[in-house]
Amino acid sequence: MKENLLIIYFLFLFVISSFAQENTILYWGELLQKNTPADNTYYTHKSPIVKWKGVNGASDYECKTDCSGLINQLIKQAYNIDDAAFNKWMKKKKRAYAKDYYNQIKKGNGFQGFTNIKDAKPGDVIAIKFPKLMDDTGHIMLITEAAQEIEPIEPTVLGTKQWKIKIIDESGHGHGTTDTRYLGNGKYKTGLGTGYFRIYTDSTGEIVGYAWSTETGSKYREADVRKVIIGRLNKKFE
């Protein structure tokens, strides 16, 4: 009898745990990235097409959007909310862009914000806000693994530490030769993929800049110019 009760108890915990995992953008992001065929993803600013096989009648996984379009759809899927509820929360008439995520994280609107890389956890997002007049408003990525401090790689910046952090994003360019979108000979496929982003910090872990990858040819960008923040969703949707 005791054994049966224990089995039922552990099964209950497993079901609860599985349900909790499905209610996260990390779960849906990894599911999408691992299963989307290469022919079913590319980078575009047009109306997003993001599908999970078996969800809402979708016959396959598909991801044709841009960086913010991906995160928008992940949140809607994980929290089962429609466009109206999402746009009301993000204070947008149509859709949210990377700069909007940076602004809302900064304000604490449904997010807890961090600027120390040591606070970053899987399931958080990295939001970057570009200066005005640039073609894009910024970039946003989903963190899948905790940051790891690495030996400094060129370009080096005096007085900084370097970290690599694994992310999923929708981009026109992959993050180095270990990125899943890398085709060889310096070429990349656009669309959904995963790779390592490089963060520069001061001695305490506060973010001072970044580079697109851990490759030596990746340019250093100052966080004073291209503003960087880490966001953790804590919004309660009704």
Language model features: what each stretch is:
Residues 1:
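Cell-wall glycan-active module
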Residues 4-16:
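Sec-dependent N-terminal signal peptides
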Residues 9, 59-60, 111-112:
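Generic anion/oxyanion-binding catalytic loop in active/binding sites
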Residues 20-87, 213-238:
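N-terminal capping segments
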Residues 49-58, 149-160, 188:
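Low-complexity, polar-biased intrinsically disordered regions enriched in Pro/Ser/Thr/Gly
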Residues 86-174:
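...with weaker cross-activation on analogous glycine-rich loops/strands in unrelated enzymes
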Residues 161, 166-238:
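Low-complexity, Gly/Ser/Thr/Pro-rich intrinsically disordered linker/tail segments
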